[in-house]
């Protein structure tokens, strides 16, 4: 990279009329450095068994989301400023209790481990963890064919969000 930086600087001096050239070169260099870090971040075998167990990676129902949470922590450790992970299957219009109870089990342990891990490593105050969806749920049960479906419709006017770290005051509730 040093040789490349030297060549880029020499080229930029020869072409001062291209002011955006330096920014473009820096962007490419950053992308390269980030790509070089990826193999180390996704190789979770280097994590102690105790850590992998805390994230639920040894249990079928939590392994997938646990892997995402642990990789997210490792990306943050490497300086990545924004990490998004995903947990699907929450759009339950019927059989809400059954559907959500299994989804909750798949994310509870990994999310807890992520927050505890960030705190233990002294990273939680500088890292904002946000858990949210794109809409809330109506307060009443859906009715399908005259039968209550024990689910909820979409509510675009309300939603639930959990935030931890990043200077957010513990126990804060906004709204009613």
Predicted regions and their residues:
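Ligand-binding pockets and gating/stacking loops
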Residues: 1-176
